[in-house]
């Protein structure tokens, strides 16, 4: 009798727990991070009997989460990838919008180069209106460059702020996980704290949105949380917080530090923080450098050609553009007093990379920031040359000192127009040649080029004479012989910063006079040469024009944006699949729960009937005994 009553009561209690659990599942069906709960029951062990064993009811062993650690980890991983893809795509989209909104640089460059053609074709040599318009076009080009440069600088600052705020959010989440670890550990003695476990999983999922993480379940019920690169973030109730600090070379650049102060910027991957750091290094830095490379190519090539011509005042042309010097940033850990001054000396050899210059105690070496070695040569004055740069080191360096060389980073935002006087446009060729009237040979000047506009004797008259058909002499106006020797057809002759090539065959006694251009007002040769720079390869070893370099930049950014959008689509799909797989195990199915509700309601009613039957039998027994 007692066994029947006890069995019924156990069934009633088990059904009650099951009904409460089903009700909790139903009410939390829309709760983010909730894991469906299930009741685990076990048959009570009946006491031993000499003849046979009768069941002794049921016990509720536990109320557990329907949970798969594998599927949950897959959700965290896919969430980190999706968050990274979302942030990366947002940044790339913003960059594309910047390029579109800040003006048409290619159009401005086309107009600028075209303005030299207009100057060359001007009907009145002394008319400065075409020259004034050219300077206006130069200002427009510089303005578009500086606007673009400022926009990119602004995004660098925005990313710095986002990195700082993200690290703060990460630290708050780490503290909360550590706190829940402690609560879960303290609660295990009184049952499994499912709600706390769900909250902790939700926090890890939130953390995975900031950076890639893994969580290891320990035997004491706590999580040990690590970054995807193995950096410990949470152990038990202790959180190893991250922090931000200045880049060792650039104090305006924010890097990520671990709890001991070590720089882990390059080790962060996944999540929004990984996207910020990855985008900054691989897209934004590259865009700034490529834009700066174009600005340097423009200013250097135009200024060089301008310096090879004569302006309306009969003077060699002065620079049209001005550029900031390349940056040479010392490491914060440098122990010596050395400083480095960088200068672009070969624009064709100039790349869009940044470099690290290191001193080992006896010699300097240079690599790209990606670690590729760069050949350096030591000049007679002690300066170093490599990658199109000349690096002048002053002061005393100590072993281990280093510098970050950024040849192009600030060039676009610092480009200005330095020429303001339209008469200063050097449209005329600096030199002219004249064959002696008594020449009898077929020789004629086919090319006369300025090779060194800084040569102080450039405009000094020189006579090129051929004593015999196979020899030549170069003599200045004072009678000084500047050069002589054997002559072969097509040979290039050079003096005073110019070079000359003849076609045909000069005869013995022939001569040619090289002098400053006395007809500069009516000459447009240098203006045409300046206009021709639009299609001249001045960058990448002479293979790319300035316009082509900018086109390459827009193509690279466009490709980065397209890849980011494609990756976002892919990661969205993969995260959806991971969520579906996880929810198939842990999610609440209302149809299933409704069926369980009926099932356990019937079990409750049946157990109540068992109790009622036991009571009825017991009452009948009492009545029989009392008769």
Give residue ranges: language-model regions.
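S/T-rich, low-complexity, solvent-exposed segments of bacterial secretion/appendage proteins
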Residues: 1-627
């Amino acid at each position: 009798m007692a066994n029947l009553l006890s069995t019924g009561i156990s069934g009633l209690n088990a059904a009650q727990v099951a009904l409460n659990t089903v009700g909790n599942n139903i009410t939390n069906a829309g709760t983010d991070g909730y894991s469906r709960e299930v009741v685990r029951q076990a048959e009570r062990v009946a006491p031993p009997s000499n003849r046979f064993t009768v069941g002794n009811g049921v016990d509720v062993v536990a109320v557990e989460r329907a949970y798969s650690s594998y599927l949950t980890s897959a959700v965290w991983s896919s969430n980190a990838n999706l968050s990274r893809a979302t942030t990366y795509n947002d940044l790339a989209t913003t960059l594309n919008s910047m390029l579109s909104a800040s003006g048409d640089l290619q159009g401005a460059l086309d107009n600028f180069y075209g303005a030299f053609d207009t100057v060359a074709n001007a009907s009145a040599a002394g008319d400065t209106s075409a020259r004034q318009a050219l300077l206006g076009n130069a200002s427009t080009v510089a303005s578009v460059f500086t606007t673009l440069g400022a926009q990119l600088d602004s995004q660098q600052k925005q990313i710095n702020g986002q990195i700082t705020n993200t690290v703060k959010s990460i630290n708050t989440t780490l503290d909360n996980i550590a706190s829940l670890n402690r609560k879960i550990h303290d609660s295990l003695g009184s049952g499994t704290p499912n709600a706390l476990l769900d909250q902790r999983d939700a926090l890890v999922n939130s953390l995975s949105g900031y950076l890639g993480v893994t969580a290891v379940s320990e035997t004491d019920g706590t999580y040990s949380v690590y970054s995807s690169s193995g950096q410990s973030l949470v152990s038990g109730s202790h959180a190893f917080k991250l922090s931000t600090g200045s880049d060792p070379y650039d104090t305006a650049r924010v890097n990520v530090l671990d709890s001991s102060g070590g720089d882990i910027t390059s080790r962060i991957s996944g999540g929004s923080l990984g996207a910020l750091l990855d985008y900054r290094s691989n897209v934004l830095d590259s865009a700034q450098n490529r834009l700066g490379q174009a600005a340097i190519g423009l200013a250097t090539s135009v200024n060089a050609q301008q310096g090879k011509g004569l302006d309306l005042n009969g003077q060699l042309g002065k620079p049209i553009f001005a550029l900031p010097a390349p940056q040479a940033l010392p490491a914060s850990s440098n122990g010596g007093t050395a400083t480095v001054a960088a200068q672009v000396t070969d624009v064709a050899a100039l790349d869009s990379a940044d470099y690290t210059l290191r001193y080992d105690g006896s010699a300097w070496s240079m690599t790209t920031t990606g670690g590729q070695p760069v050949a350096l040569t030591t000049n007679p004055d002690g300066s170093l040359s490599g990658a199109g740069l000349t690096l002048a080191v002053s002061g005393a360096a100590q072993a281990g000192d280093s510098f970050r060389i950024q040849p192009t980073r600030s060039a676009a935002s610092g480009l200005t127009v330095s020429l303001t006087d339209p008469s200063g446009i050097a449209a005329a060729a600096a030199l002219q040649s004249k064959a002696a009237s008594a020449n009898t040979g077929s020789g004629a000047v086919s090319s006369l080029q300025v090779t060194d506009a800084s040569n102080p004797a450039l405009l000094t008259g020189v006579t090129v004479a051929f004593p015999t058909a196979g020899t030549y002499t170069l003599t200045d106006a004072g009678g000084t012989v500047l050069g002589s020797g054997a002559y072969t057809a097509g040979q290039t002759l050079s003096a005073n910063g110019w070079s000359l090539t003849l076609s045909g065959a000069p005869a013995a006694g022939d001569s040619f006079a090289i002098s400053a251009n006395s007809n500069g007002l009516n000459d447009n040769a240098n203006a045409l040469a300046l206009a021709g720079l639009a299609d001249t390869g001045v960058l990448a070893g002479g293979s790319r024009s300035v316009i082509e370099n900018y086109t390459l930049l827009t193509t690279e950014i466009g490709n980065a944006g397209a890849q980011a959008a494609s990756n976002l689509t892919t990661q969205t799909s993969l995260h959806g699949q991971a969520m579906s797989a996880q929810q198939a195990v842990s999610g609440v199915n209302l149809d299933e729960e409704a069926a369980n509700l009926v099932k356990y309601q019937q079990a409750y009613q049946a157990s109540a009937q068992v109790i009622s039957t036991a009571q009825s039998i017991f009452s009948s027994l009492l009545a029989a005994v009392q008769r």
